[in-house]
């Protein structure tokens, strides 16, 4: 048997032509018989428990229920591979073909695809340039539509007619003296199929482009919307009439199974009930057409077939929801595909992978931005192959089994080896839902105690994470190529800007902003206290750690004499208040300590004194003064202090600061 695996790059949903639908379901057996059409609503025979022929579980269409065994039992064993049984017509092959072989139901009347009729926007209504309500009235047999107006004066193409109006026109057409010819009206999906088939997409697109050039406002937007749909049809090579179905694909039976429960009862997929309704109504319609039943009965049956197909494709999208036992809505094909528990998100995107784990995240403020804290328990499991390889290479163990025993015992050598292994080996962290590419980023792992993953608070906006119980998944890139890619493209420190807006996504918030504010805040009430002088920032931090000072105590920190301090005005010029418009004016001045303008707030230094070598030196304070509009001094703050020689050369200078500001300054410098 040929391999069933086939590589592909992507999955694309599009319109299938009637020929393609039949091609999915039809197969020619080795003996030349064409099979594939499901004609009976039966599933299995309740006496023999074998699938009914031409039913929803037919072995001739979908393949044998048991490996290498035909329906009647004439051929058994693998030696009969590929033989088609003369009695039952079943090909002898593996039963797993029932997972991918499809069938089809040939419809006695066309039906519309509910996605394209009732979707938002409705592609049928847009293409036909008709209101959705009118299109629905045609599909569900509430109104006629004019397909050919002929030579009738009051009729126009695509005009809607009620039943009474059409009966009057019909009387006119068939009267003896009537000269009206060429009038054709339709109802139901058949009429829509004709209207859609009459569309010449290239001509319509050209017309719309001309109209758009001469239109404005809402009309222009509507025309652009229609042109976009038509261009998409042209680009994909799809035809509008394919939105009306002549045949319905039947998915493989193993994807809608029927299983026997204890006590002889059966549990079945909802799809089987929905398919059964379609087949029953389709067969009934075909019989009514054969016996030439009245038009009103056939029309009603066509409407019921349309509703059955709607329920199969998307139950509840239009009309009443079809329910099963206990008034539970039946799961249609759309329900199986869409949503969090659907095929795509649950089964295709949500697969379990090796070398991954997940745990609760907690804040790791001491981490670098490109680091994450990985619990030891998780790290030893994720990096086990690398650890085992290194243990064997270092000669600590002889084989894999011995290495695993050493790991289980928690030998100290194992943790040393693990530290070596994770050094320079990035891991990827992902937080669901991954709505943009920054939802998964790479970090350098740091081993931590406990069972929670530590995350740097600055990367939280990218993941939309907070620490109220959020979980994150860890993935280990195995190959050297994937490790290099993670390091170069996905490392958190390389993803500073949002790909959507181009603005920084790594922005401090909440506790970080509050912490920065608290560290840099000033308490001016403490300025008048005794001045504390420190030679360097480390001494200030040491005094703070020993509880000699607190975060907001004003301290004089020595600076190198050549460090320039910016001021608003030249030194020793008293404030000159001429015209003030602001409510509060702030200026910064250098003034001697014995200045008459300002009080000597820190009087422990004399303004002028002699040094040991006889040089005359003078002390200056850098004042920050707040004035009112009238020029009255409201507040005075000392910002710096200098000691200068008589020639103006600065010998010593101090800046007034706080331990909190020194801490934040050193923290920022250490990570730059």
Swiss-Prot record:
Its cofactor is Mg(2+); Zn(2+). Keywords: DNA-directed RNA polymerase, Magnesium, Metal-binding, Nucleotidyltransferase, Transcription, Transferase, Zinc. In cyanobacteria the RNAP catalytic core is composed of 2 alpha, 1 beta, 1 beta', 1 gamma and 1 omega subunit. When a sigma factor is associated with the core the holoenzyme is formed, which can initiate transcription. The keyword Transferase applies. Zn(2+) binds at residues 70, 72, 85, 88. It catalyses: RNA(n) + a ribonucleoside 5'-triphosphate = RNA(n+1) + diphosphate. GO terms for biological process: DNA-templated transcription. Belongs to the RNA polymerase beta' chain family. RpoC1 subfamily. Gene3D superfamilies: 1.10.40.90, 2.40.40.20, RNA polymerase II, clamp domain (4.10.860.120), RNA polymerase Rpb1, domain 3 (1.10.274.100). This is DNA-directed RNA polymerase subunit gamma. It is an enzyme of class 2 (transferase). Signal peptide: none annotated. Mg(2+) binds at residues 466, 468, 470. It comes from the Bacteria. Binds 1 Mg(2+) ion per subunit. Binds 1 Zn(2+) ion per subunit. GO terms for cellular component: DNA-directed RNA polymerase complex. It holds the Pfam family RNA_pol_Rpb1_1. InterPro entries: DNA-dir_RpoC1_gamma (IPR012755), DNA-dir_RpoC_beta_prime (IPR045867), RNA_pol_asu (IPR000722), RNA_pol_N (IPR006592), RNA_pol_Rpb1_1 (IPR007080), RNA_pol_Rpb1_3 (IPR007066), RNA_pol_Rpb1_3_sf (IPR042102), RNA_pol_Rpb1_clamp_domain (IPR044893). DNA-dependent RNA polymerase catalyzes the transcription of DNA into RNA using the four ribonucleoside triphosphates as substrates. It comes from Trichodesmium erythraeum (strain IMS101). GO terms for molecular function: DNA binding; DNA-directed RNA polymerase activity; magnesium ion binding; zinc ion binding. Its EC number is 2.7.7.6.
């Amino acid at each position: 048997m040929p391999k069933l695996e086939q590589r592909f790059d992507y999955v694309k949903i599009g319109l299938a032509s009637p020929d393609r639908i039949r091609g999915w379901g039809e197969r020619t057996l080795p003996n030349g018989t064409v099979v594939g059409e499901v004609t009976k609503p039966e599933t299995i025979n309740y006496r023999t428990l074998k699938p009914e022929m031409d039913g929803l579980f037919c072995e001739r269409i979908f393949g044998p229920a048991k490996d290498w065994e035909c329906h009647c039992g004439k051929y058994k064993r693998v030696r009969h591979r590929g033989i088609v049984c003369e009695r039952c017509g079943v090909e002898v092959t593996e039963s797993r073909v029932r997972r991918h072989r499809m069938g089809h139901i040939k419809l006695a009347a066309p039906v519309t695809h509910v996605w394209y009729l009732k979707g938002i926007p409705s592609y049928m209504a847009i293409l036909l340039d008709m209101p959705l309500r009118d299109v629905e009235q045609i599909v569900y047999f509430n109104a006629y539509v004019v397909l050919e107006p002929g030579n009738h004066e009051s009729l126009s193409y695509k005009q809607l007619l009620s039943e009474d109006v059409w009966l009057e026109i019909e009387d006119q057409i068939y009267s003896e003296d009537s000269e009206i010819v060429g009038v054709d009206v339709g109802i139901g999906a058949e009429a829509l199929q004709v209207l859609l088939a009459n569309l010449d997409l290239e001509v319509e697109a050209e017309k719309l482009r001309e109209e758009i050039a001469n239109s404005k406002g809402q009309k222009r937007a509507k025309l652009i919307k229609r042109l976009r749909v038509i261009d998409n049809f042209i680009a994909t090579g799809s035809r509008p009439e394919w939105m009306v179905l002549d045949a319905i694909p039947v998915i493989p039976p193993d994807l809608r199974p029927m299983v026997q429960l204890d006590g002889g009862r059966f549990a079945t997929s909802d799809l089987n009930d929905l398919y059964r309704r379609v087949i029953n109504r389709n067969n009934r319609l075909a019989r009514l057409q054969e016996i030439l039943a009245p038009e009103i009965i056939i029309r009603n049956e066509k409407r019921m077939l349309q509703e059955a197909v709607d329920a199969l494709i998307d139950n509840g999208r239009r009309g009443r929801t079809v329910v099963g036992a206990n008034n539970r809505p039946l799961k249609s094909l759309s329900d199986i595909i869409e949503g969090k528990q659907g095929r795509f998100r649950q089964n295709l995107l949500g697969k379990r992978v090796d070398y991954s784990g997940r745990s609760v995240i907690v804040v790791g403020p001491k981490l670098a931005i490109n680091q994450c804290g990985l619990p030891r328990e998780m790290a030893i499991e994720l990096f086990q192959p690398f650890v085992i390889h290194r243990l064997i290479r270092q000669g600590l163990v002889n084989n894999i089994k011995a290495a695993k025993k050493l790991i289980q015992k928690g030998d100290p050598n194992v943790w040393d080896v693990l530290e070596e292994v994770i050094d320079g080996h990035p891991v990827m962290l992902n937080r669901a839902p991954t709505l943009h590419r920054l939802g998964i980023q790479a970090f350098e792992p740091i081993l931590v105690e406990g069972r929670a993953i530590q995350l740097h608070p600055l990367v939280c906006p990218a993941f939309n994470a907070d620490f109220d119980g959020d979980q994150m998944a860890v993935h280990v890139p195995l190959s050297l190529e994937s490790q290099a890619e993670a390091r170069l493209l996905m490392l958190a420190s390389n993803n500073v800007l949002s790909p959507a807006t181009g603005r920084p996504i790594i922005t401090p918030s909440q506790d970080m902003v509050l912490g920065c504010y608290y560290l840099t805040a000033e308490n001016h009430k403490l300025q008048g206290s005794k001045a504390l002088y420190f030679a360097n920032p480390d001494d200030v931090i040491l005094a703070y750690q020993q509880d000699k000072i607190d975060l907001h105590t004003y301290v004089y920190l020595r600076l190198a004499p050549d460090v320039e301090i910016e001021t608003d005005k030249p030194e020793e010029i008293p404030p000159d208040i001429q015209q003030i418009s602001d409510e509060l004016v702030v200026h910064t001045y250098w003034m001697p300590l014995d200045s008459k303008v300002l009080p000597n707030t820190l009087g422990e230094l004399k303004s002028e004194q002699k040094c040991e070598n006889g040089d005359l030196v003078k002390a200056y304070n850098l004042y920050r003064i707040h004035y009112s509009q009238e020029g009255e001094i409201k507040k005075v703050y000392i910002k710096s202090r200098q000691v200068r020689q008589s020639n103006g050369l600065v010998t010593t200078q101090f800046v007034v600061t706080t331990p909190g500001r020194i801490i934040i300054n050193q923290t920022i410098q250490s990570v730059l």
